[in-house]
Amino acid sequence: PFDTRGAVPRLPQQPYHMVSRVLSVTGPAGKQEAGLTAIAEYDVPPDAWYFEDGATGCMPFSVLTEVILQPCGWLASYSGFALSGETRFRNLDGSGKTARQVRPGDGLIRTTTTLTRCARVGPRTIVFVALEATLADGTPVVSLQTSFGFFTKAALASQAGLKSTDEARAFHDAPADPPDESETCLPVSARRLDLFDVIDRFEPTGGETGMGRIRARQAVDPYAWYFKAHFF
């Protein structure tokens, strides 16, 4: 039995579990080769919490990414890349296109995920996948090429993170200069998707491209719902 060969990463739990079913897989469990494909579906509840909390009436992008990336994690675990039970799973990068918003009446999202290649460097494994997400009638939603890494706890502890710049550090340390409330007209997310406490600095022409830069802050609640829901 597959579960006797080691511990593998599991999918997030509610309210961030975004796989309703896996319809098919083209190969047996533990097979690590390019071309392995899985088809998964997520039933979109018309009254889902994120439609209300997101304030736009559409599925928030943070939720959509879970819908399309969780099948990637499932396929990587199914393929046996983490059977040692000693590795952590991280999404690394991606390049894709979003074709449309997902709305309450759309029914379901079907994601076809294909393992394209993998690479091992010491205890690290990098897995590359391509996916297409559509509605039940085939209407395109997202196409994406992305990669994931399996890392040891020691490797994650020594990671350097994103390289900062003097300009970024100066912006981080700059005094508060919040926008005038009369200048803000867009609705903000609420409840579970209310993920900042305050916007304390706004530069309309800031940033590398001159198109604006904003600084938000949130006091991290160790009991926040997303810690338990998303792997932890």
Indicate residue ranges for each PLM-predicted region:
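Hydrophobic beta-strand-centered segment that forms part of the acyl-chain substrate-binding groove
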Residues: 1-4, 72-116, 143, 149
